[in-house]
């Protein structure tokens, strides 16, 4: 599912989504190490147990974060794509693309982490105005139009939703 959201509202939308207690575990992807740390910090401030893994963390810190996530001491793992490579997580409820990947194949790798071993899993993506081009490239690669969630409290006001009438240029 795709959530169109203004960049400044992504943080609030993520907290809103994670308030659903039926989500036992979530893997949140960012494009950068700095972004992963930032997301982890604001989730922790919102009393959502989160840890970040990325290339600037020691191997020991990454392994501890992963262990805490697998045993559900940590509910949310925030990761960059490189750090998440090779990670095997069973029973992952939700993958959240907090930032749309700029490489379409990366999207496929990210969403492939949910619903393994015949279990239910879901992937959602937050798309702001600057990420629309990445979304187009992803949809072209997978040949699927990703369903849009058009009712949420932080719906973007400046991103045209597919099928909406286009504004005429003066």
Predicted regions, residues:
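Conserved helicase RecA-like core
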Residues: 1-160
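Intrinsically disordered, Lys/Arg-rich low-complexity segments
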Residues: 162-170
């Amino acid at each position: 599912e795709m959530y169109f959201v203004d960049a400044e509202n992504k943080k609030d939308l993520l907290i809103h989504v994670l308030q659903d207690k039926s989500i036992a575990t979530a893997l949140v992807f960012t494009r950068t190490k700095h972004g992963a740390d930032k997301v982890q910090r604001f989730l922790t401030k919102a009393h959502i147990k989160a840890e970040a893994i990325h290339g600037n963390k020691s191997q020991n810190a990454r392994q501890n974060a992963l262990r805490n996530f697998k045993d559900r001491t940590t509910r949310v793992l925030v990761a960059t794509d490189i750090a998440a490579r090779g990670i095997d997580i069973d029973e992952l409820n939700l993958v959240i693309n907090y930032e749309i990947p700029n490489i379409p194949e990366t999207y496929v790798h990210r969403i492939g982490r949910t619903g393994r071993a015949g279990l239910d899993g879901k992937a959602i993506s937050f798309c702001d105005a600057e990420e629309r081009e990445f979304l187009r490239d992803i949809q072209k690669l997978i040949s699927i139009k990703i369903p849009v969630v058009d009712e949420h409290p932080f719906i973007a006001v400046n991103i045209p939703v597919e099928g909406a009438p286009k504004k005429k240029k003066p």
